[in-house]
């Protein structure tokens, strides 16, 4: 999941019921991967008051306890490879998510149209 998809799904706001149902079904099957980078990005957004999460640790714990998401951690190679991507997208978080999705042969759930320029499968409901 792209970070915004994770935030939207966890808050159940700004997304359709179809989106929520789709992710709930995929999570139950163990098919939803979330990069640990997304938790870092979410914490930064919360700290900067760009999103409202009262307690980031409780938010993360609740998410992990109430879902079957699979956390993936970036490797040193992922980090290096993210710098070698074409410069269509400048956001280092998204570049790393692109590399991780590609490595895991996963579909990246995102509405970020800049990501469409890369060789990674994307999806948005």
What do the predicted segments below correspond to?
Residues 31, 68-70, 121:
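Conserved beta-strand segments of alpha/beta enzyme cores
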Residues 87-93:
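Donor nucleotide-sugar recognition loop
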